[in-house]
Amino acid sequence: MARIAGVDIPRDKRVVISLTYIFGIGRTTAQQVLKEAGVSEDTRVRDLTEEELGKIRDIIDKLKVEGDLRREVSLNIKRLIEIGSYRGIRHRRGLPVRGQNSKNNARTRKGPRRTVANKKK
């Protein structure tokens, strides 16, 4: 396995797919990186030369990926919570942040149902 940005990327997959294993790189960014490096998208990782891998590493080093990106996202959420914005409050309560309905759905964000016991009559 080749190692790029601290991530082992699979050798048997196409390069454009393998790069998406890195947090912060999706299909579009992977295609842009390969175009800039002059590498075909259809090439398998095992067929890349050290020179091509070096070019790809250099380009990805300029991008914000993995730990740096995760840290930035968590700091952004922390900032929203600290300033007391609506989005920050939704994050704190564990509810959907982007205006989705939360009366019936939103189970992923709210977690499993907590049933409330009925009072005895």
Swiss-Prot record:
Q: Which GO terms describe its cellular component?
A: cytosol; small ribosomal subunit
Alphabetically, the GO molecular function entries are:
rRNA binding; structural constituent of ribosome; tRNA binding
- Tell me one Pfam family matched here: Ribosomal_S13
Cite the record's Basic residues compositional bias ranges.
Answer: 106-121
**Keyword terms of this UniProt record:** Ribonucleoprotein, Ribosomal protein, RNA-binding, rRNA-binding, tRNA-binding
Superkingdom is Bacteria
Q: Give the GO terms filed under biological process for this record.
A: translation
Q: Which residues form the signal peptide?
A: none
The region called Disordered is annotated at 93-121
What is this protein's function? Located at the top of the head of the 30S subunit, it contacts several helices of the 16S rRNA. In the 70S ribosome it contacts the 23S rRNA (bridge B1a) and protein L5 of the 50S subunit (bridge B1b), connecting the 2 subunits; these bridges are implicated in subunit movement. Contacts the tRNAs in the A and P-sites.
The similarity comment for this entry is: Belongs to the universal ribosomal protein uS13 family.
Subunit structure and binding partners: Part of the 30S ribosomal subunit. Forms a loose heterodimer with protein S19. Forms two bridges to the 50S subunit in the 70S ribosome.
**Stated name of the protein:** Small ribosomal subunit protein uS13
Q: Which organism is it from?
A: Bacillus subtilis (strain 168)
High-level lineage: Bacteria, Bacillati, Bacillota, Bacilli, Bacillales
Q: Which gene codes for it?
A: rpsM
